[in-house]
Amino acid sequence: MATMIRGHRLRIAEGDIPIAGVKSSRIYSDISPFKKASDLMIHWNEFVFKVMPEDIAGDGFRLASIPVIPSSEVQAVLRKRESTNYVHWGALSISIDALFRKNAGVSGWCYVYDNRWETFEQAMLQKFHFNLDSGSATLVTSPNFPVSLDDPGLSNSISVAVMFENLNFKFESYPISVRVGNMCRFFDSFLSSVKNKVDSNFLLEASNADPLGVGAFGFEQDDQVSELFNYIQTVPTQAIKFREHEIPKGFLGMMGKKKIKSFEFASGSKGMERRKPNRGKQIDRSFSQRAVPGFRSQNEKVEHQGLSTDSDFENFLRNKRGNKAGVKSTASEGSSVDNISSREFQFARQNQAKEDGSSSEFAAQGGRKSKGISGRRKQTSSWKDRGNPGTDTGVHLREHSDPGNVRADGVSGPSGGSEINGGSISPRVLQPEGSGQLDQSFQDYLFGPEHQQNDIPSGL
């Protein structure tokens, strides 16, 4: 991986879309006032993800993965220009916004990586630490590499993993908003106009975010850090509503119009209704579980096993050469765990563990104490072939198609549009999907009672 270098400084847009502050002329050399961005096949998109407390496991610790571009946008480009074969990732912005008071003591880490790689060292693109005491943190970087539109891993060619610490919110609230913007360019055969032909992953700008090395996370070896990626989960979704409106630019619209595309996404079946907050009741989970492949170390060509929490990670590193012992599931055959809250199920699990004489604890005060079951992960593609609806991930998408360079402009105006795919137009709750063979009790706590003993590896 190329060494990260300091690139062009830009002013991060406050209260707007950070990716809109990135000049296309910073990345490409053929930008001209006489050429439209649409003619150059340059697109600006932004996704907005809501992170719910059910997506955050005990002690305010949670790691989630976010693909950057929905396949529906790729299909739209292919319909307009069938000869298009590749997409170049020009710039990427990641904004993490706190939906709570300032100076609450919430911080975290963010990784940008290419999930198509098998090794962590080659997959890593960018990593930084952020602090939400000021309410928001943003990093803008340039991945600067192309991907084939026929690649089954297109949606995962740039993924963002965000880990929060000390985020102790109650169930069914929205404490965090993650905005991921990208500037990409579609092309046919070869893109010779890229200015930086040597480096990838160079930093453009940062606000309340500090780029970090591996040592800053308390790990000594890269292959140990790669274990962290076995926590990652992705949420396959479908577009349920599409809107498009135009915003006049300049005086009386003399500067033209800015086209805004808005996508709303949902996970699970189309008939799933929006859930209202109801403390003590857990949200039903989709059964379409899938696992994200883990990374292998370049030194040890073996696949890393799935771990539940950071304590599992530490225990695994200490005992990686020793015997692996399984943890018995506390959900016995014939027991009913439906229609109870996650906390009630946790207490029932702890009581069952005491009766069975189990030595494992699910949670303890002052730390994340959960022991996981190691297991191999299945390789599953998250992108479908051309002509089929792919895997879209997100809650909201805004696209810019402006003549020339795009700068930070306010986005406002009435909302109006139409439905697609026949789904409900109301926003829907994103559901986390399975992340591999995890500890059974930890799965039940996070994902609900449908994760039964058949999720445990057959060897145990």
Curated annotation (Swiss-Prot):
The alphabetized list of GO BP terms reads:
proteolysis; symbiont-mediated suppression of host innate immune response; transport of virus in host, cell to cell
Provide ranges: composition bias, Basic residues: 368-379
Tell me the leader sequence span: none
Q: Which GO terms describe its molecular function?
A: serine-type endopeptidase activity
Keyword Transport set for record? yes
Start and end residues of each stretch annotated as Disordered: 267-314, 349-460
Keyword annotations for this protein, in alphabetical order, are: Host-virus interaction, Inhibition of host innate immune response by virus, Suppressor of RNA silencing, Transport, Viral immunoevasion, Viral movement protein
Give yes or no: UniProt keyword Transport.
yes
One Pfam family assigned to this protein is MP
Cross-referenced InterPro entries: Trichovirus_mp, Viral_movement
Of which family is this protein a member? Belongs to the tobamoviruses movement protein family.
Purpose of the protein: Suppressor of viral-induced RNA silencing.
The name on file for this protein is Putative movement protein
Q: Which organism is it from?
A: Apple chlorotic leaf spot virus (isolate plum P863)
